[in-house]
Each structure stands twice: as structure tokens, then as C-alpha cells.
Amino acid sequence: MEPSTLYFYVNGRRVTEKNVDPETMLLPYLGRNLRLTGTKYGCGGGGCGACTVMVSRYDRGTGQIRHYPACACLTPLCSLHGAAVTTVEGVGSTRTRLHPVQERIAKSHGTQCGFCTPGMVMSLYALLRSHPQPSEEQLLEALAGNLCRCTGYRPILDAGKTFCKTSGCCQSKENGVCCLDQGVNGVQEAEGEQTSQELCSEEEFVPLDPTQELIFPPELMILAQKQPQKSRVFTGDRVTWISPVTLKDLLEAKAKNPRAPVVMGNTSVGPEMKFKGVFHPVIISPDGIEELSVIKQGNEGLTLGAGLSLAQVQDVLADVVQQLPEEKTQTLCALLKQLRTLAGSQIRNMASLGGHIMSRHLDSDLNPVLAAASCTLHVPSQEGDRQIPLDEHFLSRSPSADLRPQEVLLSVTIPYSRKWEFVSAFRQAQRKRSARAIVNVGMRVFFGAGDGVISELCILYGGVGPAIVCATDACRKLVGRHWTEEMLDEACRLVLGEVAIPGAAPGGRVEFRRTLLVSFLFRFYLQVSQSLSRMDPGRYPSLVGKYESALEDLCLGHHQRTFELQSADAKQLPQDPIGRPIMHLSGIKHTTGEAIYCDDMPLVDRELSLAFVTSSRAHAAILSMDLSEALSLPGVVDIVTAEHLGDANSFAKETLLATDKVLCVGHLVCAVIADSEVQAKRAAEKVKIVYQDLEPLILTIEEAIQHDSFFETERKLESGDVAEAFRTAEQVLEGSIHMGGQEHFYMETQSMLAVPKGEDQEIDLYVSTQFPTYIQEIVASTLKLPVNKVMCHVRRVGGAFGGKVGKTAILAAITAFAALKHCRAVRCILERGEDMLITGGRHPYLGKYKVGFRNNGQVVALDMEHYSNAGSTLDESLMVVEMGLLKMENAYKFPNLRCRGHACKTNLPSNTALRGFGFPQSGLITEACIVEVAARCGLSPEEVREVNMYRGTEQTHYGQEIHTQRLAQCWSECKAKATFSLRRAAVDRFNAGSPWKKRGLAMVPLKFPVGLGSVAMGQAAALVHVYLDGSVLLTHGGIEMGQGVHTKMIQVVSRELKMPMANVHLRGTSTETVPNANVSGGSVVADLNGLAVKDACQTLLKRLEPIISKNPKGTWKEWAQAAFDQSISLSAIGYFRGYDADMDWEKGKGHPFEYFVYGAACSEVEIDCLTGNHKNIRTDIVMDVGRSINPALDLGQVEGAFIQGMGLYTSEELKYGPQGALYTRGPDQYKIPAVCDVPAELHVFFLPPSKNSNTLYSSKGLGESGVFLGCSVLFAIWDAVSAARRERGLPGTLALSCPLTPEKIRMACEDRFTKMIPRDTPGSYVPWDVVV
């Protein structure tokens, strides 16, 4: 068959392609073929939103143009025939005009690293094309599928809200009060307290003008109106794509290719082919078949075409619900409820109703409801039409109930509900939106005579087995029973007996899932009872009071953000930018997609791609490695092994590639080099390795302790007389807390490009790294070259957080080796799953403590032991342990303290630095100890915190003097700003009247030491050139990874040289211009490099002083020309030797830190005791920032770090299998905070400026400190859990573990449902996952 031609538009320009490979997705095509690099690769599975574009299509049936967001990483190029694609470049640019969305996100300070920003822009843009004045709920829905690791989302939401309708009301009357009227817990604030400083002027924003948008191409409209004559066929190397254009063609194609999947949005088949190794040689993708888009309201039900997207289904259901009487819409409302939280907007607009039904995923949110409602599927074939029930047999793929191979799903009919029929749907996930359900359920009951006697009952659960499960026997036995609590108890017993979840069930969380089975049943019972009461109050009593709080899920509510920052000094010159909220200087480029990251760089001539082969075993000997099949594949050039590297394979105590054994799943074994990325990855899958498992296999901290498996010797600090203090203590307790690890989840994965220069063995490296010098050194060592022949360049990094240092150097060294060996450029971009598997993250911690204290809560003795899971190599683990010990006391003076730390050697990928560097773990252990002391003393944790807090001038446990007046000020200000006492009383009142939902309030202090522990690690350099036109080029050793260091450095130059910031340019960081620079991290990047930049500027000014003094009113252009004429150098090197710092671990004493950042945070939450869900109601943060160089950037660091910390402590859960494999390898399984997790109210306050003569303009580094404040949310949750436990007569204290996920919250709120579930005997099964 002759290949078809593909026509579509991109940014208003026609694209014509022949011979399209069906395996080509839109994302790589945009970057490689069209050089549109603004659309980013973040995960490859539609889970992060970085690749969002807008797709526009003309609907021949309605005559309307539909604009919707889509994930380019999952959009097959073949599917775009007749569509118009808009990328971020097509929305606006610096060369043409900025779109209001781009302008407002940038000027609202909504970008940091900028890698997620194009996706954010496109999600908002697509929303505005359909809803020019959206509601706040529509805004939240539009951004639910976009992840950001830097900003904390608040400034992005602020930008989006400028387009919203003036009323931001939640449109509901939760507890009978509108969200705009109720304050928090009924505590109203004074009018003045609700105002906020402006960081940008909304009046200056360009108004949105829908008439100025790109029009839909008339050519495509004409093309769509013409009835196509025949199916389109595209044939690639491995896959054939058939696009039938009529139902007849579709049925014919399916008859000829009965095993071929029918693909509409590619959101199910696409990930299966990419991540699960499923292969389909033929794919059928209908295009524009009207019968697949039918919407028909009949007398008995609603018929929806299988080709409708889930977003279209959502819109249709919302319209129909408004038209029909309530009694007919039970099923429709249940489906709507599930659709609101199902995936992100991009996926809902791509995925089809038919695809969702036919995929029959075990955790499908719609199928349990559709099956419970007895829906019917219409399935034609060439042999005729059939109707089959969508029931449990269909969902379990029973051959007698399934579609025949030649049939297609055409439509589904959803029956209207009847009077006295009730349908409900529930789901529980790790995150409120855009997260797969852990358990979901569809439930329907029918009381035929309206007498409360069950005539029909249907309950289907998802997420509890290999397929959706129907509790058939339980439902049958309950028919004829009255709807009473006795019936409920019997129903719970029957369901638990029928729906069995084995202890070793895939997915884990077994007891939680069992509890949800009956918790959801209880909620269904209550909702039906309440409906019965409304319909016939005489017969059915109201549930108001006892059970009212259990009826509904948590409501997210209205969002508000305020901040009180610092203003610039009134005495400084107007043009002096220091202290002013200057926008991130790459902000506009972030929003237009013009900011270039490593993988955006153009292809180099004859460039190669590299893909790694990693170990599938955690501890094993390599018996053999067969490369023959991989080497025989087309395009494969070479495979690099440890043997090729020789003695260069080893550096420090690590190896680049495995030699004779592997130490973890994800250990690098070899690297495949091929002409393209696709060829390299396919070849990597063909490398055959034979292993022999070795003993012992050590994964957990407990196993490491058992096998005495540790790196180095322990680290120890001690002050006072601990033994004597314990003897005199009035009370003593012992406890422990386990804290899980955390994935960096920088939005840009590990990326590098090695380019041999062609002579003298020179090589240039373009790497996404925090430490170019280290990359340079390791690569030079591997290539056996002097360092001066290896140059590392970094323009910007798409997020790092400590994760782009050690492992990045290993990846870069192997990439550079391949490049130099073949004298060709080599590019290596890790996929998200590879990145998460290989690179490690934050160390899991086990903290054990013994504490002696007085009855007033004052701690007199503390003996603490830290165990960190370091993984298979040492990496940064020793320094993490050290920093954890040095910072462990947080804000408290413990007079007698002993603390020890151990780095456990295990068979996991090496863990490494992550924002906070040990303090988020060690600080949490201390706070958990404080909470337990408070419970033992019958005091609030806040009272115990105050009793033990540093006061005035003190000495730390390592002997450094500390002045803590600002700490006390932060604490008292936070208490006042948060109206803590009033809200504490309000929370208690709420809890007294709400048995099933509880609120919690917690406040934690912060003392974060800043410094790197040695002088040498703190040195920095800068280079400043003044050109003859008066412009300045600045280079320094710091890396721009989102924190705005380049912006701050240009502010420094502007102040020192008294010139506009626009006159100063900074191209990036390079070992060629500033050699031997230290790592960018530890909150000191701006501090150290800023002092070097300041030194360079002052050197220049001193050199030019005679010239300037002769012409004081001259311009820089005139001064530069005069200096040149007098042979005076216009270049200056600035240098800062580093802060004075030392630490003697033998003596346990020293002065490792230059200064301390102080702060406090108060958070309020509400939990759902039935499901474990929680919502973040409000957070107040007070920070001591010294004198802020840029309040807007500093606010972004505080908020972003807080949200990242909140994720660490509540939702981000790494899951490992019992053989050491990481399960959580992408946003589908690993849940960082999303827009829905941001506190409804977030208030940030900076203390007035303070002076510190040693730092840059008295500023303080804020990159890491805010992470720890996220634990205020954890302790607020625990406060709520404790309230629930006290009410149930349970001990208020229970061993804390972190993260405090919905599973842990629910299981801690013990009740009759947790007690009725079956329990497995430990040791009788192998659990699906292990706690490492």
C-alpha cells in the first residue's frame, strides 16, 4: 500500500511529512526536526506536564474548534493529521511579543530553574483559549498535571489568578459557611493583616486579548470538512499505523488485524510499549469517525461514543446533570466525581472513554462505577453488532464476556438511576489529584419499594487484585436486608471474607487496602442513609451530629497568599538594585522556551547517543556478558565496558563501570553507543548478562546493623556529663523514628554532551551539573589527559538539589571516553526511570534516642544515635552524617548531649547530597523526641520547645558561640502572626464536634547553620570584563540551577559599578573562564561568589579611580575608552578565600559555620480519619534572612524549599522490592507535591534587616533551610491523629515514621474498621516491599 502523507500545522506553519515512523512521538520531532526545543522532556509518561503543548482540532460534527492541552511525549506524530499544534514558541517570544501568560508568570516570579515553565505556560494558555476568564477551580484543574520542583507553585498560581473571575469563592457552603467568610476555624483576621506587599505591578500587565491569538488554519478546516476517501497508512521499521476514516474501514482493519490495539490517545498503549516492553506490529487509530463521538440522551440512559476524550465526557456529564432530575443522575455524578481527580488535564484530554474501559487497569477509576451501574457496551464487527454488559466478567477479561478479536468498542450506554437508587464512587491515592488510586470503588444500591430494604446491591473494588473485583456473594447475601448499622457490620464482614488481599500482594499497603474496603463501605452507608433521610425524613433519621463529619471527602477550598518582606534601604540610590524584588533574569526566556538546556543544544555533525545497561541484581557476581546481539543491531557503533576503561575505571573508592560484580540494582555495567538514542536503547535491551547472586543481601538499616556493615568509623559529638544527667533526671524515655529517603526529582534529568575538538585531544563537555570542576577532573583522569585539555561548560541546570555531582561525573566520564575513542560527539540524556534508578537520593535514617527530662519538659540529658542508609558506595554519606550531627539539636540547648552517627553500607544505589544535607533527617529525629517528651509531661509540644530553646548567647554542642536573639524573635513573631493561641482553641473546638475529621496545629522553630566546614571549600572566584562600549561581561564559579544566583551576581555588579543591570551580561559558567571553582550547594553559592564578584568590581574601580575622578559625570563607555587609551586593563579577577571555618572531629569541637538562619513555621491541617487523606489549611512562616539582596528570589527559595520539605515528610515514598529493585521510578509511582497540595493559605514574613559584616551586604543563604519547616505539616498531622486516638481511648503517642502518608495516617486512626480486618502472621509471606 502506498504510504500516506501527513499534514498538520505547528505554530501556524504547515508541516508535510511522508514516510513517518509510527513510533515517532511529537516531542522528539519538535526538538530534532523543527528545532523547537521549548517543549521539554521530563518523564516520558505524561506524568509531569513538562512537554505540554496545545492541540487544536476542527470538529466536523459540531463545527467547533477544540483547543486542548496534550503531552507531546505520548502523542504519536501519525495521530496529528489535520491538527494544529501550538508550542510555547508559538505563544510568544522575545523576538516578537510576549503573551500575557508568559509575561505574568515571569513577572510574578513563577520561574526558578525554568524547566517546567513551558509546560506551565501551555497548560494555562490552553485553558484561556477555552475559558478566557476561568474560575479558580478551573485554574487548579488546568495545572493539576504539571509538576514543579522549585517554586512551590504559589507564584504560578498567583500569575494564573490574574486571569480568573474576580470571585474566587469555592461555590460551596462547607459547614454552612462560605470559604471567603469563614477565616480559619472561624478565626477572623483584621483587615490589615490580610494585605500583602507587591512583588510586581498587576497594572502593568498586558491585558489578555483573545482576538490576537493564532487562528485555526483554514486549510485544516477545509480538510476536516471534506470526507476522506480512504484510510491513511504509515509504515515504519517495526510498526504499521492504520488510520481508518469510516466505521466500515475501521471494522475492516480490525478484521484483518484482530490482535492490533485500537488507539485514540495513546495514554495506555504508549506507556506499555515504552516502559513495559509490550510490542504491537500494527496499531489502528481511528480518525474523525462520527459514530465514535456520538452523544445521545435516550429515555433510559445516556450513550457516549468510545472515541470521546475523558475531558469531553466530563463536560457532557456536567451538562446532562444540570438538565436531568437528581434521581436520574446518581451514576453520572459518581463518574463526574472520579473524573475530577483522574490524571491531569493533558491526559484527560488525550485518553478516550473507550480506551479507559478497554484497558481494564486494575486501578481504573471509572470502570467500577460503570460496572456497578450495569452499563452496556456496543461492539460491532464485520459479522454484525452486539451488546455486552460491562460487568465483573468483562473486567476480568473472561473470554465469554469479552470482545471478540475482530470487534471494536463503539459506544457505552449508561442507564439513568431510578428513584430509591443510589450510586457512589470513592478513591484513595497517594496524592489528591493526578495520582493512581490505591483503592477505588463503585457502589450501587436500589430499594425497589422505597422501604429501606435492599433490592439490588453491587460493589466493585479496584486496586485490590489483578483485576477489578466484584463482591458478588456479599451483595447477594445482603439483598433483602434493611439498611441499618447491623446490615453494615454484616456487609463489612462479608466483603472482607470475599475480597481477599494476600499479604504479599503487589503494590503493598495490604492492611491499608483492607481497611479501605470497609471504610468506603461505611461512607457509602452514611451517604445513602443521608439521602434516604432527605427523601423521607419521617422514616429515616438524620445523620447530622454523630456521623456528619464522615459523609464527604475533604474540600480543598479557596487559596490565599500573603507575604511581608523587606524593602530596599530608603537611603540607597534609585538605580541600586540591591534589596529590590528583581525578576529572575532568565524568567522571560523560561516562559518563552528560549532558555537553552543541555539537551536543547543542536545536534553536532555525526553525533552519537549513549545508553547505559544497568544491573538487575542487587549483589551478584557477573559470570558472563554477551554483547553480540546488541552489536549486530543497525546503528550500533560500540559498547564500552570496564575492560575498555582499564585502570581508568577506578577513581577514589568507586568504579565507573562494574567489573566482576554488581553492588546494587542500577549499578552501571556497560554503555551502548549508537547513531541514535532509539538505536542505543534498543541495543541496551539486548545485552545478555549472566549473574550469580552473592550473600549477604543487605538492603535495610536494620540488616546493616545486624551484619555490622558500615562505612568508615562512627562520628561522635559530646558535651556535658550525659551519664550524671540521666541519674538526676525526673523522667527518662527511649524511642526511635524511621525516616524514608527522597528522590531529587529535578525536572531536567542527568544530561551531557561530550564534543571532541579534533586536535590536541581537547574535549568540551556540556553538562547539567553543580560541580564543573569535579566533572573536569574525573573526565581528565579517565581520559588520562591533563585537566587543561578538558573544559566543562554549564549555562543553566534544570534543577539539581545536590543530585548533580558525583553520579553525574561518572556518567560524564563514560560519555567523554566514548566520544574521544570515536572522535565523535556523544550525547547522553537519562530517561526519568533510569535517572531515579541510578542516582540515589536523600539518605533514609533511623534515629534512636534516650532522653532524660524534668516534669516541666526541660531536657537535661540526650543520648542519640543516627544510622543513615548510605547505599553501596560512600559518595557524600560521611559528610551527610557529619552535618546531621552538627545540626541535630536544631533550636535547642541540650546541656548534656551525646550523639553518634553511622553510614550503613547496603546494596542500594549510593545515596548522596539532597537539599538540607542531613539536617532534615537529624532535625526531625530531635523534634520527634520533643513531641514524645511533651506527651509524657502532659504539655503541648510548643511549650516543651520553648522551655528548651536557645536563649541569648550560648555555645553549641561542638563549642561554637551562637547569638540567638533572632531565633526568639522568629518564634514570637510566628506565634503572633499565626494567632496561634486563638487557633489552638478553635482546633480543639472543631475536634470536639467532629469525630471523623480532625484538625491539627503545630509550630516548629528553625536554626540552620550555614557553611561548608572548611576554608578551602568556601573559596570562590569571578571574572569581570568591561568592553569599550561600556558593557560588562561577568563570569563566576556559581551554577544557575534555579535559585537566581546569576541575577544576584548582576545585581552586585550593578551596585558596585553603579551601572544599570541591563549593561551586564552573564553567559554561563565554565572551567575555561573560572577554574577550580567549588561545588554550587550548601546555601552559600550567592554568598561566596557574590563576594568574589564584589572583589573584582572593586579591583576595577580602584584601577580606574584616576580616570573616573577626572570625569565624574562621564559614562562607562567614556571611562572604558580612556582606560584603553592609557593601556589600563579592563578585566579583573575577583577572589574570596572562604569563611573562616574548622572542625576537629577527634576533639568534637570547632567553628564549622559562618552564620545561622533562623525561622519558625506554624501549620494547620485537617485529616480524614476514614481514608488517611489530609489537606493543608494554612501555613505561616517567619524567616530571618539578614538583609535580603532580592526579596522575590529569597521568597521563592523559602516557599519552594518548604513545599519540597512538605513532600519529604508527607507524600514522597520510595518503594524497594525485597531483592533491591526500586519500584518508584517516575511521577506515576513517586508523588512529589502538586498544585493541590499547596496550603490553602500561605503567609511568609521576613524579619526586619540585620547586619552581618562578614557576608555579602549582610544577606543570608536561604536555599536549604526552609526544607525542614515542612515538618510543621507532619507534626500538625500528628496532632490531628493524636486527637483522633485520644477520642477513641487509645494512647496519644504512637511511634512516628516518615513520610506520614495516607496509609500511616489511616492506620494510626484506629477504629472498628481497622480492628475488623484480617492480619497476616509476620514471616508467613514475603512482603512486596521493604522499608530501607
Curated annotation (Swiss-Prot):
Sequence positions that bind [2Fe-2S] cluster 2: C113, C116, C148, C150
Highest taxon in the source lineage: Eukaryota
Enzyme class: oxidoreductase
UniProt binding sites for Mo-molybdopterin: Q112, C150, A800, F801, M1041, G1082, S1083, V1084, V1085, Q1197, L1262
Domain FAD-binding PCMH-type: 234-419
GO molecular function: 2 iron, 2 sulfur cluster binding; aldehyde oxidase activity; FAD binding; flavin adenine dinucleotide binding; iron ion binding; molybdopterin cofactor binding; NAD binding; protein homodimerization activity
CC annotations in GO: cytosol
Keywords assigned: 2Fe-2S, Cytoplasm, FAD, Flavoprotein, Iron, Iron-sulfur, Lipid metabolism, Metal-binding, Molybdenum, Oxidoreductase
Subunit: Homodimer.
Enzymatic reactions: an aldehyde + O2 + H2O = a carboxylate + H2O2 + H(+); retinal + O2 + H2O = retinoate + H2O2 + H(+)
Disulfide bonds: none
Names of required cofactors: [2Fe-2S] cluster; FAD; Mo-molybdopterin
InterPro entries named in the record: 2Fe-2S-bd, 2Fe-2S-bd_dom_sf, 2Fe-2S_ferredoxin-like_sf, 2Fe-2S_ferredoxin-type, 2Fe2S_fd_BS, Ald_Oxase/Xan_DH_a/b, Ald_Oxase/Xan_DH_a/b_sf, Ald_Oxase/xanthine_DH-like
Cited NCBIfam families: mam_aldehyde_ox (TIGR02969)
Name of the molecule in the record: Aldehyde oxidase 1
Cofactor: how and how many bound: Binds 2 [2Fe-2S] clusters per subunit.
Residue intervals of the 2Fe-2S ferredoxin-type domain: 4-91
Other information: AOX genes evolved from a xanthine oxidoreductase ancestral precursor via a series of gene duplication and suppression/deletion events. Different animal species contain a different complement of AOX genes encoding an equivalent number of AOX isoenzymes. In mammals, the two extremes are represented by certain rodents such as mice and rats, which are endowed with 4 AOX genes, and by humans, whose genome is characterized by a single active gene.
Cellular compartments annotated: Cytoplasm
GO annotation (BP), single: xenobiotic metabolic process
Assigned EC number: 1.2.3.1, 1.17.3.-
Catalytic-site annotation from UniProt: E1264 (proton acceptor)
Entry function: Oxidase with broad substrate specificity, oxidizing aromatic azaheterocycles, such as N1-methylnicotinamide, N-methylphthalazinium and phthalazine, as well as aldehydes, such as benzaldehyde, retinal, pyridoxal, and vanillin. Plays a key role in the metabolism of xenobiotics and drugs containing aromatic azaheterocyclic substituents. Participates in the bioactivation of prodrugs such as famciclovir, catalyzing the oxidation step from 6-deoxypenciclovir to penciclovir, which is a potent antiviral agent. Is probably involved in the regulation of reactive oxygen species homeostasis.
PANTHER family reported for this sequence: XANTHINE DEHYDROGENASE
Entry binding sites for FAD: V262, V263, M264, G265, N266, T267, S268, V269, A343, S352, H356, D365, L409
